Structure formats: C-alpha cells, structure tokens
Amino acid sequence: MKNFNRRAFLKAAGATTAGLVTSGLILPASAQPQKMPPKPSNGKSVMGLISPKLSTVRVGFIGVGQRGYGHVKHFCHLEGVEIKAICDTDPAVLDRAIDFVVEQGLAKPNAYTGSEHTYRDMLQRDDIDIAIISTPWQWHAPMAIDTMENDKHAFVEVPLAMSVEECWQIVDTAERTQKNCMMMENVNYGRDELMVLNMVRQGVFGELIHGEAAYIHELRWQMKELESKTGSWRTHWHTKRNGNLYPTHGLGPVSQYMNINRGDRFDYLTSMSSPALGRALYAKREFPADHERNQLNYINGDMSTSLIKTVKGRTIMVQHDTTTPRPYSRHNLIQGTNGVFAGFPNRIALEQSPFERDEKGGESFHRWDMDMTRWYDKYDHPLWQQMGKEAERNGGHGGMDFLMLWRMVYCLRNAEPLDQDVYDGAAWSVVNILSEESVNNRSNSVTFPDFTRGAWKTGKPLGIVGA
C-alpha cells in the first residue's frame, strides 16, 4: 500500500468506531451479551422440577426476627407440616418463636443460636425437608446454597441474591442437587395480582405489550432502628449502591403476567437514579448532628427508574422509592392491545369490555372503571375463591403471605412444580445489580444473563390452579 500513514489511519478508524457506537451500530461494552457460564457437569435444568412427594413437610427456620416470625405463625396453622428446628443469633427472638409454637399445642422445636454460622448445624439434621430463610439480604444466597448442599429445599425471602455471581451459584447448585430454591415473592399471591393473572390468561387485555412495577413505600422511619430489626442493616444499603435495591415485589406479578422465563425473558435494561437527598435530610431533622446516621453518605437515588426490554419486544418500567413522602404503590399495571389494568387504586379500561359493551355500548376505554366488585365476581382466581377467606383470616399482607406458604406446602405434598422457581428468583433479583451497573455507566443498557440457559423457550406458562 502506497503512502500509508498509520497515525492518520488509526485516528480516522477511531473516529469511525466512535460514530458507529453513538449511532447504535456497535453496542457499548455494557450492552454486549454476557458470556453464559457452562452448565454444571452433573446438573440439569430444574424448570418444572417435581420433587418426591412429602406426606409431611418438616421445616427448619433460619431467622425469626420479623418476617421469619410471621412465617412461623403461619406454619403453625398449616396442615401436614412439622416445625423441627428454629435458628436465630438473637436468643430473645428465638425463644419468642419457640414459645409461640408450644402455645399452639405443637411439639417444641429444637433451638439453634450462637454464631452467624450456627445455622449450618441445623441444616445437618436428617429430619428437615425445607429451610425457610428470613435474614438480612447478604445472607440469602450463602444460606440458600448451604441448604441445597445439605439435601434440603430452600425457601428464601426477597431478594434471592445480591450479585450476578451469587445468582449463578444458586442456579448451578439447584441444578446439580435437583433441589427447589424458591424466592418467596408473596405479592404474586395477592388477590388483585391473582385476578389479573387469571384475566391475562383468558385474553381479557389482548396481546400484552407493556407493564409497570414498583416498590414505592416510605420507610425512612426504619433509620431509627439502630441495634436490631430491618432498619439496623437495610439503611446501610443506601450507602453502598445506587440502583433499584428491591425490585421483586412489583416485578414478580408483572413477570408472571408476561410469562417471563416461560416463553419470553428479560433481554436488557437501562436505569436512571434521581438525586439522593431524602435520607440525609431526614437524618438531619430526626437525629443530633453528631449521630451515626448523620455520618453516613447516602448515595442511592431517592427514585430509581428502570426500563426492561424483553426478547419479544415488550417493555416494563420498574421503580423503587423508599425515601420520599408519598402513598404506597406497586403500580401493578399491565397494558395489552385491548386495554389496561392499573393498581393503587385498582382500575380497568378496555376497548371490548364484557360489561360496558352490553350495558352502554361505545368505547369504554376512555374512562376508568374503578368498581372492582363485578370484576372480582367474574375473574377471581380459583385459589382465592377457595382459600381467600382462610388467607384473610390468617393474615399476612391481606392474606398473600399465608396463601403463598399454603401453596408451597401443597406443591411439596402433592409432587407438583412450585409456582416460582430458581430462575424466576434470579431474573427478578438481578435487576438490583444490573440497574446499578447501568446508572454507573450513564444509563447505557445492560444485558440480562439467561439463567435458564435457553430453557425459557420451551418453559410451560404458569397455569390457573385451584386448591
């Protein structure tokens, strides 16, 4: 080649590459597909896993301070279960849980306390089938992995894990051990969420195109929990990350509406965070100037907003805000070609409505229908029709907690697949990590790992089941 100027060529090539990146013809590194780790040598998919039937589900609890104590109460009222052991590092809450079990006329569970790793002693018992894990977030993944390694099913509070690596470790362990690992997303068992799932399955909204999910819940008051309870550890996550810290409550139901991991999956997301102002202002107002809460650097944006694109092209907005003064909301919005359902407050607008078309005619989608009575009558989920009164009587966020636990036990006792599997927990939880990565990279898109390793293409959609 004559008259080749290497410096000029490299300069021109660099400019061309930059132009291709900004034009979208070449993806930035953050949007490149993530390398899928190899399948474990002795593992296989747990999609639709059916475990051997358990006539009695023998339970061990790890963590009974707040959520875990509520689970203990519910398990005392479930048929076909035995509470064998309870573990907590706090002797006071451990004794409280054991005393409650005994007060119900049930056998006294064995107690485990001591170090943060004492739970491993409990997991070595051969008379426990499942472990219920309700501990601070950073313990969820290691405890779930240890549970499965000890030949037990793991049921974990949200979120499932706090890193992409932990998500893969949990998936790999589940596939190798062939044990269930379910992240206990209770909101999927709410009456409204179950009704909407039933409506989606019946085609009421047409083809789905968009969803909106959120966890908007003012929790600044937890900053006053200094020595124990949720605020003693959750507050510090606002100083460590800047993204969606808690995505699953809103995202879980919307994912099931859209058959995520069962015919569609998350492809990539982009995220933005607002300024982080509210917690520092609250600390300044509520605590002395030299208080430890005023020495923290709160970096997590008060409002986190993510947009997810699925492989089928659908979009999902996911928000997180536990700081600003505003009413509670999970959004719970699902939009289809025939109309929309939105929550908080519940309302429906359809182009072809089974009610408005007959009564008034014309286009009913220009006005919200906020009277849910007839919608419940027509579309209440069979589970809620059969178990709703018992769920409400036992309580737990309007009955969703009890119904979730009841359904878990039912599936284990009847050799049926669980409603949520390890792939769901990983996909919903990893938004936490990916949103932070996007925020830190000027909101560039970040690709979701395919935790199913392609099994989402043939996964069976969650059915409408009864009791």
Swiss-Prot record:
Annotated residues for binding of NAD(+): Q66, R67, D88, W137, Q138, W139, H140, E157, V158, N186, Y246
Binding site for substrate: Y215, R234, Y246, P247, T248, H249, Y328
The entry's keywords: Glycosidase, Hydrolase, NAD, Signal
UniProt cross-references to Gene3D superfamilies, sorted A to Z: Dihydrodipicolinate Reductase, domain 2 (3.30.360.10), NAD(P)-binding Rossmann-like Domain (3.40.50.720)
Cofactor(s) it depends on: NAD(+)
Post-translational modification remark: Predicted to be exported by the Tat system. The position of the signal peptide cleavage has not been experimentally proven.
GO molecular function ontology, one term from the record: nucleotide binding
Comment on bound cofactor: Binds 1 NAD(+) per subunit. The NAD(+) cannot dissociate.
Superkingdom of this protein's organism: Bacteria
EC number: 3.2.1.-
Leader peptide range in chain numbering: 1-31
InterPro entries given in the database record: Gfo/Idh/MocA-like_OxRdtase_N, Gfo/Idh/MocA_oxidrdct_glycsds, Glyco_hydro_109_C, NAD(P)-bd_dom_sf, TAT_signal, TAT_signal_bac_arc
SUPFAM superfamilies associated with the record: NAD(P)-binding Rossmann-fold domains
Described function: Glycosidase.
Similarity comment text for this entry: Belongs to the Gfo/Idh/MocA family. Glycosyl hydrolase 109 subfamily.
Name the UniProt record assigns to this protein: Glycosyl hydrolase family 109 protein
The organism of origin for this protein: Shewanella woodyi (strain ATCC 51908 / MS32)
